[in-house]
Every structure is written in structure tokens, then in C-alpha cells.
Regions:
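Helix-adjacent hinge/juxtasegments
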Residues: 45-85
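Alpha-helical segments flanking ligand/cofactor-binding loops in enzyme cores
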Residues: 20, 47, 51, 73, ...
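Short helix-loop-beta junction
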Residues: 20-29, 80
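C-terminal binding/interaction regions
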Residues: 2-6, 10, 89-149
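A short beta-strand-loop structural module common to alpha/beta enzyme folds
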Residues: 28-39
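Glycine-rich phosphate/diphosphate-binding loop of Rossmann-like nucleotide-binding domains
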Residues: 4-24
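Residues that form or flank phosphate/diphosphate-binding pockets in enzymes
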Residues: 13-14, 40, 70, 114
Length: 149
């Protein structure tokens, strides 16, 4: 799989760990930065990840920050992105199975790397269940289309 990554300074170290983990598991990583712990604003990195996913350059994206909240919000501004902030394996699984999330948001100041990597693995291995969730996603897409006119 091709996975796009983007982080601000607070998510940088966790991004490095996630990138290494993904590469060790045979995934291709597209790294949109940042490249240090020097303070930066997160929205451009999250938008770049979202655009990689929407364009098809990446199958999924992962954005990382201090809490992951702002990163999820920023990524969700890209039309077609369904970013989910996940702090455990259960929410990561449901984000994919029920919401067909295509971007995972993680908090570098919230999660120890060992837990974050487990969340990444669950997120990437879970699949959308369809069924009643398809109808709900269509409703979300309708809202997105109306708001983006």
C-alpha cells in the first residue's frame, strides 16, 4: 500500500516511527513533512496528505500532531477525505468498518509509539462493511457536496 504521511512539529517523532513501521511492513510511504521538531503550522501538511489520497497517489493517509484534533479537522477540509482521530484500536477499526475513513489522525503527545503503531495496523487492515453504512456515507457526501458549492 502507498500511505501518505504528514505531521507538524508535535507529531514529527511519531511520524518517523510510523514511517519506519510502514516501510518495515512493505508499504510505500509518501512523506509530506515536516522534517524536524521546529515549530510549524499543521494545516498545509494535512491538506497535502488529503490531496494525495483524493488524487489516488496514496491509498490512505496518516496525519500526526500534538493531539491529532486539528490535524483531523484540517484534513477533513479536503473534499472526499474522511479523517478519523483514533486513540485506540477499537475506534480505528470502526473508523474503517463503519465510516470508510481514508485518513487516520494520531496525537503524538497522547499516544506512546507502541500504541500508535497498533492503531495504524488495525486501521490499515480493517475494511469497510458497507450495508447500512453505505447509506450513511452517501448522506455525508451529499452534505459535503452541498456545502462545497
Amino acid at each position: 500500500m502507498r500511505i501518505a504521511l504528514g505531521a507538524d512539529h508535535a507529531g514529527y517523532l511519531l511520524k518517523v516511527a510510523v514511517a519506519k513501521h510502514l516501510a518495515n511492513h512493505g508499504h510505500d510511504v509518501i512523506d509530506h513533512g515536516t522534517d524536524s521538531e521546529e515549530s510549524v503550522d499543521y494545516p498545509p501538511y494535512c491538506a497535502a496528505v488529503g490531496r494525495s489520497v483524493v488524487s489516488g497517489d496514496a491509498e490512505f493517509g496518516i496525519v500526526l500532531g500534538g493531539s491529532g484534533q486539528g490535524e483531523a479537522i484540517a484534513a477533513n477540509k479536503v473534499r472526499g477525505i474522511r479523517a478519523a482521530l483514533c486513540e485506540n484500536e477499537y475506534t480505528a477499526r470502526l473508523a474503517r468498518e463503519h465510516n470508510n475513513a481514508n485518513v487516520l489522525s494520531l496525537g503524538g503527545r497522547i499516544l506512546a509509539p507502541i500504541f500508535a503503531l497498533a492503531i495504524v495496523d488495525v486501521f490499515l487492515s480493517a475494511t469497510f462493511q458497507g450495508g447500512r453504512h453505505t447509506r450513511r456515507l452517501a448522506q455525508i457526501t451529499d452534505i459535503e457536496e452541498e456545502e462545497c458549492l
